[in-house]
């Protein structure tokens, strides 16, 4: 919004040309989202408290968590508010990638809001049924996957539509340009062609998988938000590189026109996340709830797909992956041993993984900070793939 206004007025005020610099707008988006969160945070907490939207805590969880019962949840609305305002103010609103990322983020946010609302109203930690939640995630994820299959390879919506129609006329069997290939980290000029269907399936799995992985990780005060900020900032760097014809050519990455604008979105997400952490650090004054976790995970997955760094997201988001795998392994092993031995056995003391470490004697703050450190190292490792190829 401000970019369009500055471009309109820059002939009369040359200093407004600074708005054309992506890095300047990224910094301002971070500051804007951060200030919105810090200023509005206390009011959001008071409102959530007045609405009596307290978190229902699992009775079978660590006993130290029982004191958290009643802490306001649905604090993710504060994050989404900061992201929305900062992105709308500082991003180029004619950019197609901004709108598809916003659609996924706020679409998943709505799903999370409904889930949180049911938890609060019915005092049930389970919320929406897994089937219902998965259905609506799939609707949004598949829509985004189909659109992105064609938009990452073309520079305008008109050409995106032309490519889509060419695919339809080919009997849904046409391939995609090299820009849509699956990129392999640490390898130069080698990628795996996915085709339209392969791209759609992979994108769907990345977006929905990232959303649920972040949601599973959100179980301790401050645990999930800092990894989201770190991974989001790292993806913002990739977006800046892929969106630049100069840097992408120098680093031997495909140039994806318009992807650089996602740096603004990632910056807004980082600022909003840090503001939320101010109130979510131990002992938390509010929890983000599914409205925040599902939305942020979907956002990370969508950005990773656009900048063609699905595998790097898997690396940088290693904490999210480990948390998800711990749940899958726990459930699978329990069912297998119950069939085999007549009683279910557990691989971990409790899943997700952060609860296992809590029950192993780690304090909550130790788990959180150590997971942050691991994520920082993984993000630095992921960023090294920019040059080590």
Swiss-Prot record:
Quickly give the catalysed reaction: UDP-N-acetyl-alpha-D-muramoyl-L-alanyl-gamma-D-glutamyl-meso-2,6-diaminopimeloyl-D-alanyl-D-alanine + di-trans,octa-cis-undecaprenyl phosphate = di-trans,octa-cis-undecaprenyl diphospho-N-acetyl-alpha-D-muramoyl-L-alanyl-D-glutamyl-meso-2,6-diaminopimeloyl-D-alanyl-D-alanine + UMP
Tell me the GO BP annotations in alphabetical order: cell division; cell wall organization; peptidoglycan biosynthetic process; regulation of cell shape
Listed A to Z, the keywords are:
Cell cycle, Cell division, Cell inner membrane, Cell membrane, Cell shape, Cell wall biogenesis/degradation, Magnesium, Membrane, Metal-binding, Peptidoglycan synthesis, Transferase, Transmembrane, Transmembrane helix
Q: InterPro entries from the xrefs? A: Glycosyl_transferase_4 (IPR000715), PNAcMuramoyl-5peptid_Trfase (IPR003524), PNAcMuramoyl-5peptid_Trfase_CS (IPR018480)
What cofactor does this one take?
A: Mg(2+)
Q: Name one GO cellular component term.
A: plasma membrane
Which GO terms of the molecular function aspect are on file? Answer: metal ion binding; phospho-N-acetylmuramoyl-pentapeptide-transferase activity; UDP-N-acetylmuramoyl-L-alanyl-D-glutamyl-meso-2,6-diaminopimelyl-D-alanyl-D-alanine:undecaprenyl-phosphate transferase activity
Is Membrane included in the keywords of this UniProt record? Answer: yes
The residue ranges crossing the membrane are 25-45, 73-93, 97-117, 135-155, 190-210, 222-242, 259-279, 287-307, 311-331, 366-386
Specify the pathway.
Cell wall biogenesis; peptidoglycan biosynthesis
Stored PROSITE patterns: MRAY_1, MRAY_2
What top-level branch of life does the organism fall under?
A: Bacteria
**What are the EC numbers?**
2.7.8.13
Q: Pfam families annotated for this entry?
A: Glycos_transf_4 (PF00953), MraY_sig1 (PF10555)
Record's bilayer topology term:
Multi-pass membrane protein
Where does this protein chiefly localize? membrane
Compartment list: Cell inner membrane
Functional note: Catalyzes the initial step of the lipid cycle reactions in the biosynthesis of the cell wall peptidoglycan: transfers peptidoglycan precursor phospho-MurNAc-pentapeptide from UDP-MurNAc-pentapeptide onto the lipid carrier undecaprenyl phosphate, yielding undecaprenyl-pyrophosphoryl-MurNAc-pentapeptide, known as lipid I.
Check the record and name the NCBIfam families matching this protein.
mraY
Q: Which family does it belong to?
A: Belongs to the glycosyltransferase 4 family. MraY subfamily.
**Name of protein:** Phospho-N-acetylmuramoyl-pentapeptide-transferase
């Amino acid at each position: 919004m401000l970019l369009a206004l500055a471009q309109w007025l820059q002939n009369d005020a040359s200093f407004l040309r600074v708005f054309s610099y992506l890095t300047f707008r990224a910094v301002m988006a971070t500051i804007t989202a951060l200030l919105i969160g810090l200023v509005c945070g206390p009011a959001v907490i008071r409102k959530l408290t007045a609405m009596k939207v307290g978190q229902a805590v699992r009775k079978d969880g660590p006993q130290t968590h029982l004191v958290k019962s009643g802490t306001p949840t649905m604090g993710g609305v504060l994050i989404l508010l900061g992201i929305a305002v900062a992105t709308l103010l500082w991003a180029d609103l004619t950019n197609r990638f901004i709108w598809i990322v916003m659609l996924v983020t706020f679409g998943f946010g709505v799903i999370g809001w409904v889930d949180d609302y049911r938890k609060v109203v019915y005092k049930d930690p389970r919320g929406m049924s897994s089937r219902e939640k998965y259905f609506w995630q799939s609707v949004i994820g598949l829509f985004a996957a189909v659109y992105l299959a064609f938009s990452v390879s073309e520079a305008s919506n008109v050409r995106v539509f032309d490519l889509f129609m060419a695919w339809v006329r080919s009997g849904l069997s046409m391939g995609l340009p090299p820009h849509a290939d699956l990129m392999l980290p640490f390898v130069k000029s080698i990628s795996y062609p996915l085709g339209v269907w392969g791209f759609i399936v992979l994108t769907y799995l990345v977006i929905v998988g990232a959303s649920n992985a972040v949601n599973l990780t959100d179980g301790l005060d401050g645990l999930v938000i800092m990894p989201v900020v770190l991974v989001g900032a790292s993806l913002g760097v990739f977006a800046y590189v892929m969106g630049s014809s100069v840097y992408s050519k120098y680093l031997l990455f495909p140039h994806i026109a318009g992807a650089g604008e996602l740096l603004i979105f990632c910056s807004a997400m980082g600022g909003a996340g840090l503001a939320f952490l101010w109130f979510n650090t131990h002992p938390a004054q509010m929890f983000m709830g599914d409205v925040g976790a599902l939305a942020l995970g979907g956002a990370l997955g969508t950005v990773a797909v656009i900048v063609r760094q699905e595998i790097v997201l898997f690396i940088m988001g290693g904490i999210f992956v480990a948390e998800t795998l711990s749940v899958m392994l726990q459930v699978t092993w329990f069912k297998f041993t119950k069939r085999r031995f007549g009683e279910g056995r557990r691989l971990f003391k409790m899943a997700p993984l952060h609860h296992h470490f809590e029950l192993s004697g780690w304090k909550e703050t130790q788990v959180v900070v150590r997971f942050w450190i691991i994520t920082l190292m993984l993000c630095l490792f992921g960023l090294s793939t920019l040059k080590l190829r």
